[in-house]
């Protein structure tokens, strides 16, 4: 997991996401990805859930790096195996709000929530992250107003 986090950080640095964007813009991206996760859950779409869990984690690694925090430790969780009654989306939304309110200092409850969602859907958390990284590792694009826009979306309108 540590190597995967380092690859994500390097990918973000190569695309100027660390210094060329802001934590606030990355948090908006995190909310976008979390919205996709909620859509996947509401549709019981396992592929969308897996993709979104990984995407949320990738954005959190980037955000963590932007605020100067070491991403070490994000890989040292010992996650349980909750059932659906132990997990609610509103708890993660609350954790996301706390994460932003406290200057992005406390990513762990959000990461734990993402891991719990993976467990509920019998997904391997690290596989979710690996899939997300493999999807973005060769992605090209450009920074526009502090937001990385992937090459495929550069010609799209209002997407």
What is the predicted role of each segment?
Residues 1-159:
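Flexible "arm" and connector segments at domain edges
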């Amino acid at each position: 997991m540590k190597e995967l986090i380092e690859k994500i950080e390097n990918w973000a640095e190569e695309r100027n996401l660390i210094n060329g964007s802001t934590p606030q813009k990355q948090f908006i991206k995190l909310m976008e990805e979390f919205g996709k996760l909620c859509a996947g859950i509401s549709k019981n779409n396992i592929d969308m859930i897996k993709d979104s869990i990984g995407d949320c984690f990738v954005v959190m690694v980037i955000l963590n790096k932007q605020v100067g925090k070491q991403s070490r430790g994000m890989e040292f969780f010992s996650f349980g195996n909750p059932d659906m009654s132990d997990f609610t989306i509103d708890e993660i939304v609350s954790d996301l709000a706390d994460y932003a309110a406290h200057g992005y200092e406390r990513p762990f409850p959000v990461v734990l929530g993402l891991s719990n969602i993976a467990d509920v859907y019998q997904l391997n958390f690290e596989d979710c992250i690996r899939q997300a990284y493999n999807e973005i590792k060769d992605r090209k694009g450009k920074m526009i107003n502090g937001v990385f826009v992937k090459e495929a979306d550069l010609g799209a309108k209002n997407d």
